[in-house]
């Protein structure tokens, strides 16, 4: 398995996204709603509803950053990007070790990624 760690967003973009996500009533729901059978056992977080206006707006920003990044394009050769999800964990929440499904509701997922908006204090998933 290959890992690519790379600064995708600049400080201004991160700040913008964080402020958007901090607004009240953004439509956060139980992350298990989109988890596969195995992942739902270890998934304990919140996820922004994909149909919300803010999710669509921020997904477009992330997608554009990925598609316009030369290093990511050379590493992945993306043909289509779909299924961008925004998740957060409060105290006591985590997303344990899991394998992403090859097929998700939005299509085949040959490659998955995590974009951290905060410093990586992530210890329970596949990022070490």
Residue ranges, per PLM feature:
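Non-heme Fe(II)/2-oxoglutarate
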Residues: 1-78, 83
């Amino acid at each position: 398995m290959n890992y690519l760690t790379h600064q995708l967003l600049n400080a201004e973009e991160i700040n913008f996204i964080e402020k958007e996500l901090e607004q009240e009533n953004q439509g956060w729901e139980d992350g298990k709603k989109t988890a596969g059978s195995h992942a739902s056992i270890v998934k304990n977080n919140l996820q922004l509803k994909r149909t919300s206006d803010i999710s669509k707006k921020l997904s477009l920003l992330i997608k554009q950053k990925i598609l316009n990044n030369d290093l990511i394009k050379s590493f992945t050769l993306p043909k289509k990007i779909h299924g961008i999800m925004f998740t957060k964990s409060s105290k006591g929440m985590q997303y344990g070790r899991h394998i992403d499904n090859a097929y998700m509701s939005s299509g085949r997922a040959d490659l998955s990624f995590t974009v951290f908006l905060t410093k990586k204090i992530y210890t329970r998933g596949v990022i070490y």
